[in-house]
Amino acid sequence: MKNTFGSALALTIFGESHGRAIGGVLDGMAAGVPVDEGFIAACMDKRRARGDGLSTPRVEADNVQLLSGVVNGHTTGTAIALMIENQNIRSGDYAKTADLLRPGHADYTAYAKYHGFQDARGGGHFSGRITAALVAGGAIVLGALNRAGIDITTHIARCAGISDTPFALDDAAALAAQVSVLESRDEGFALLDASVEEPMKTAIRAAGSEGDSVGGILETAILGLPAGVGEPYFDSVESLISHMAFSVPAVKGIEFGTGFGFADLKGSEANDAFRMKGDSVVTATNHNAGINGGITNGMPVVFRTAVKPTPSIYKEQETVDYIAKQDAPLSIQGRHDPCIVPRAAIVQTCAAALAVGDLMTARYGTAWMERPTSYRREGL
């Protein structure tokens, strides 16, 4: 099992849904980087369940304990160990269905790989609960990126068949204004168009009342990345962002910029024309989402991820009793989200921050953290 992402800047995660704690170790941060625990807490709060019919009744405090690597609000340059206690656990909910494979979950694949030694309580290490560690570690990196002039944010582009206003892919100024609006809001329901919030919430609650669930699409924007970050082929910007994006449970698809829409365009329509804006090279359009040949060109990076409906539903399903080796009906117990899309928005933001932080460190070393306002002028 590989629990580490990143090479120049790496996060290792640990824990299970119903274990004593979950957490991570962030390695590669320079010494002297400010760490705002209030900012980390705010990110965690956007992910936290509220027991409001829109998310799981399992409400956790999600207080992040920084065990090492941070003193007096600054990094020491050593590994940052962080831990989040699991305090609201009801493992008994899973006892009656322990031998039944839950459709859409990793029960069967985990059994095939780990031969019954996996922790199956609440999904164990496969649970979305583990994304709390991604948010905690990613928030530290996101704070450092923000100080270097790089902003990352995510909104709910679509949920339960209802769409929000999309990001302005071809208008960098309008996109920056949209990002500013989203970052100014503290609530965990990230939308640009406030008029679709109640219809979305109503649809989520309706699915939950029927014992069902719904999915959606998240849209993430990355502003301020300098040109020249990334590698061709295997460590391309798309490759590393996708690597992290698919590490968020329930994500089943991704596209950058115009994405699958390229299939219906001609080359004359798909190419982004270059032009000068002062001393900077920009593109007239941004179909390619700020990436050419796996390397950033300085334009905004925009990508969308498809999030499947929560697989834990309360409707009876057909499955298999893998101990008795026979077909069986399944009625899931426990506490589950009717939709994880709203809570997953901050997870995708922090996942992207980890990928971008690794890319930036591979390109600039730790200079972007140590000298966030001047590293671009140093000719690195």
Where are these regions (language model features)?
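Internal helix-turn-beta structural module
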Residues: 312-380
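Glycine-rich, mobile lid/loop segments that gate access to catalytic sites or pores
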Residues: 113-230
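Alpha-helical support elements that line or immediately flank enzyme active sites
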Residues: 20-32, 128-150, 235-243, 299-301, ...
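Glycine-rich, N-terminal phosphate-binding loop and its surrounding beta-alpha-beta segment
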Residues: 43-109
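A short glycine/serine-rich beta->alpha loop
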Residues: 10-15, 118-130, 227-231, 288-291, ...
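Glycine-rich anion/phosphate-binding loop at the beta-strand->alpha-helix junction
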Residues: 14-20, 135, 210-327
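N-terminal, positively charged regions that mediate nucleic acid binding
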Residues: 1-58
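Short acidic, glycine/tyrosine-flanked loop/strand segments centered on an H-E-D-like triad
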Residues: 98-124, 319-338
